[in-house]
Every structure is written in structure tokens, then in C-alpha cells.
From Swiss-Prot:
Keywords: Cell inner membrane, Cell membrane, Cell shape, Cell wall biogenesis/degradation, Glycosyltransferase, Membrane, Peptidoglycan synthesis, Transferase, Transmembrane, Transmembrane helix. This is Biosynthetic peptidoglycan transglycosylase. Belongs to the glycosyltransferase 51 family. GO terms for cellular component: peptidoglycan-based cell wall; plasma membrane. One of its GO terms (molecular function) is peptidoglycan glycosyltransferase activity. NCBIfam families: mono_pep_trsgly. The chain crosses the membrane at residues 19-39. The keyword DNA repair does not apply. InterPro entries: Glyco_trans_51, Lysozyme-like_dom_sf, PBP_transglycosylase, Pep_trsgly. It comes from Klebsiella oxytoca. Peptidoglycan polymerase that catalyzes glycan chain elongation from lipid-linked precursors. Its EC number is 2.4.99.28.
Amino acid sequence: MTFRFSARCRLIKRFLLRLLLACAVLWGGGVALFSIVPVPFSAVMLERQLGAWLSGNFHYIAHSDWVGMDEISPWMGLAVIAAEDQKFPEHWGFDVPAIEKALAHNERNENRIRGASTLSQQTAKNLFLWDGRSWLRKGLEAGLTVGIETVWSKKRILTVYLNIAEFGEGTFGVEAASQRYFHKPASRLTAAEAALLAAVLPNPIRFRADAPSGYIRSRQAWILRQMRQLGGEGFMRANQLH
């Protein structure tokens, strides 16, 4: 009995190691490939689509249209940086002071969890991983973040982020969002429109750009102020992000 149990444990360990190796090869290949190739779909898009089908919702379609940075208004990149990660051009994938503040806040407020994910971390998660707060997913996210920060430029990270971010039910990427909410291409987004889209990013299922609540309007105004304080379009040029 003991021998059989030990043999079974060895088989499980071997299987898990092979699975981990296969995932590492797959993710490493993805990091290298998507440094130059447009992203056709993300893990979050796949998760949303499969979830809809499994729940019997066959009308749901995860929609995205890839566009290059030269086809995206500079206001949009500036808006998500102002809203989500103002140290994006400076850090190496992680904002350590923000993480420390979030940990301290979460210890005091267990019912109001605050995140500190950078745009790089969000890109890694959205592109390759699943939703959740497990330590396993966080560990994989950290490794993938280091990978994309090593291989990709900051401009590339921002481009991919803007193309796979979720802006509403079935709406992924800034081009699809711009067409849905403003009926025009992402290249023509104004500062106010970009700030409105960025305002829903913390929870694009709960918050809506086409029916913004008072909270979203106040968040939009805050983002616009932050965009001005960062330096407007000049910030994007100075940091070679557009």
C-alpha cells in the first residue's frame, strides 16, 4: 500500500512538473511572439466567452479590433496612465511603494481590498491568466510581468494593454470601445472621452461608459486633472509612448 501511494505521488509530481514546464514554454513563446505580432485574443476574453456559453448565453460575443499605437489617440494612453499607473514610464513592472500602501490598507480594511497592480501586471494577467486573487496566480503574474518588461518596450506594453482591456460587456480594446460608445475610431478620441473610458476600468462590468454614474463622472474629472498635471500630450512624447 505504501509503495503504491509513493508511486502515485511520484506520477503526480512528474505530471505537475511537465505541466508547469509546458506552461512556461507556452507563456515564454507568447511573450516573445506578442512583442511583434498583434494579439488576436486574451485569456480574459476566452474566459468571458466560455463562461457565457457555459451559462447558456449564446448571444455574448467577446469583440476586439486590434489597432497600433499610431491609430490610438494619445489622450487614451495618457488617461489610463493617469488613472491606473502614473509611474508607468519609471518602474520595472512593479510599484513597490504602492504595493506597501495597499498591503497596509488591506490589513486595516479587510472588507475594502485595494489593489496596486501596474499596467504591466494588468497586461500580463489579462493576456495570459485568469481572474482571482490566489497566491499561485499572483506568483505567475509576477513572473510574466518580469518577462514582458524584459522583452517588450513600454510603448508595446501600453499598446497591448489598450487593445485587450475590458471596457464593457463583450467590449475589449479601445477601438471596439470607441466605436461602441462614441461611434468613431480610437484615433479621434478626445481627452474627455478617453478619461471616461479610463474611469470604468476598475470594474467595466459594474460601471458603464454609456450610462455613467455620478461616481464615474467625478472619477472622469479627477483623471482629466491628473492628465493635465502629468503634462498632457507632451508626457507621451517625452516618454516615447506614442
